[in-house]
Amino acid sequence: MGKRLISQRRGRGSSVYTCPSHKRRGEAKYRRFDELEKKGKVLGKIVDILHDPGRSAPVAKVEYETGEEGLLVVPEGVKVGDIIECGVSAEIKPGNILPLGAIPEGIPVFNIETVPGDGGKLVRAGGCYAHILTHDGERTYVKLPSGHIKALHSMCRATIGVVAGGGRKEKPFVKAGKKYHAMKAKAVKWPRVRGVAMNAVDHPFGGGRHQHTGKPTTVSRKKVPPGRKVGHISARRTGVRK
C-alpha cells in the first residue's frame, strides 16, 4: 500500500500544516461602530507599527481617546505618533476611517466592510486599494483590485489610502531557503512537487521509466477511494477547447 497523499496529511492537521497562529499579532479590525462614529468622530493615536508574520502588510497599534486599544491595517505615509480620525465627520486624509457614503468618488480605499460594523473584510493585502465609483442612495459602488464592481451599504466603513507593504514583490527571494521560511510562516508546504515526479509509493501518477500519468487523469467524485482522488475530479471536459 502506498503512502498517504499530501492532501490527506493536510486534512489530518499535523504541525506541518497547522497555522502558527500563536505568532500572530492579533486581529486587525475597526473599533465597534457606535453612535460616536455615526454622528461625529473618534480620535486615535498610532503608538507603534508592528510586523505581522501572517500578513503581507504591517499593522498599527492604535490607542483611542475612549481608552480602547486595537490593531489596524496600516496605509502608506503614516508613522508613529500620527493622529487618525474614525467617523462620519472625519477628514478625507490617508489613514482616516469613514463610511463609504461619506467618501468622495475616485478616492482610493482599503480594508472595506461588507456589513456595517464587521471590522473590515476586503482589500487588506500589501499594496492593494479599491476605488469609490459612485453613490446611489444607500448603496456605494466600489471597484476592487480584481476589477470586479461590488455594491455595498453606504454605512460600511473603509480606510482612505493604499495598504503599506506594496513593494514587497520588488525584492527577489534569491534563495530557495528564503522562500521556504516565508511559506512556513503562513503554514504553506513548499515546494509543491508534481505527482508524476514522485515515486509510485507517494502518488498514483508517480513511478515509471519516464514521467507520465500511466492512467486516466479524470476520476469520479464519489466512486474512488481517498488515495486515488487526484487529477481532474469529475471534470466535464479536459484539454484545449477546439
Curated annotation (Swiss-Prot):
InterPro entries: NA-bd_OB-fold, Rib_uL2_dom2, Ribosomal_uL2, Ribosomal_uL2_arc_euk, Ribosomal_uL2_C, Ribosomal_uL2_CS, Ribosomal_uL2_dom3, Ribosomal_uL2_RNA-bd_dom. GO terms for cellular component: cytosolic large ribosomal subunit. Keywords: Ribonucleoprotein, Ribosomal protein, RNA-binding, rRNA-binding. GO terms for biological process: cytoplasmic translation. One of its GO terms (molecular function) is structural constituent of ribosome. The keyword Ligase does not apply. Belongs to the universal ribosomal protein uL2 family. One of the primary rRNA binding proteins. Required for association of the 30S and 50S subunits to form the 70S ribosome, for tRNA binding and peptide bond formation. It has been suggested to have peptidyltransferase activity; this is somewhat controversial. Makes several contacts with the 16S rRNA in the 70S ribosome. This is Large ribosomal subunit protein uL2. The lineage of its organism: Archaea, Methanobacteriati, Methanobacteriota, Methanomada group, Methanococci. The gene is rpl2.
